[in-house]
């Protein structure tokens, strides 16, 4: 009888843990550690160390559920519990369903959905992009809803996500809740994210003590190559090079050497987008009497990174931090080049208060203090459509890039 009683208690404890895993989740978010055409990493955060790190999933066209179990750790210094399960061997461009912790019954409650990316670009691929996300919950909720309404394949988020400065777990709770609630399309499909680091992820803005300098960024996200600068390749057609503008890694040195090799090995990719936080061609924060592009960190980016962009060719560059809207003229060699210049898009105003913009910046084609996101369409024929969209849904600027990448130019 005593053994039976113990078994009942154990069963009830496990059942309670499973129920908690479903009902007390703070946030669910999808990322990639590798091939987005055949994998998906499911992450979720709650407060309970004992709940299982298990995901049940299936191709939405099939009846049978499979399970995968991953890892669990605390997002120190908080007590938030992070669970992470990488699903592999998935079919490209396919809708999948998943449930946390408990195998679904006939009713299949708590089901979420995601879609893998296509292996070959045989349809338009759409993503949203932006950064500097959450001064207030109202701001980030508005833009997350707008992003979901566009039904993108994924989101590219260029840093300053929760404005937690490496110390405030409560802001991450807000950010995770907002994304989980609102970054889902009308059919309940969750939008995966590609994330970069910004100064507000880091204690002091710049700090090379990894991961302690940015414990929540490194705790919440399993990054390709296990660092804040990395490449993510989408099938045979696109690559994103996510960089760290001197937040937890310096710009020159190892990161620049890695960038040179990463770009050289991706010459065959149709589309290639660098993504980073601090802008080379900004809209504010200029030294006294000078344009923003003359800030020392902007000069450092132009000195070490942009020569590689120009040498190998890119599709466009995403920059952030300055809390405005920006689209530059096509630029090459630090001057306008309408024939073969690079367009820089920014400046990080997803969900923040905006700032004034310079009226006489020679490199700016369009700049204004407006919260926005970019809606980007990669077309199979090689063109790129970029729409700038406000929280109310207004398309207030747009550009069509007629070449998939700028033509490489030898130094």
What residue ranges belong to the model's regions?
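Bacterial N-terminal signal peptides
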Residues: 6-15
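Intrinsic disorder/low-complexity segments in short proteins, especially the signal peptide
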Residues: 14-17, 95
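Boundary at the C-terminal end of the N-terminal hydrophobic targeting segment
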Residues: 19-23
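Metal-dependent phosphoester/phosphodiester hydrolase catalytic core
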Residues: 24-357, 364-370, 375-410
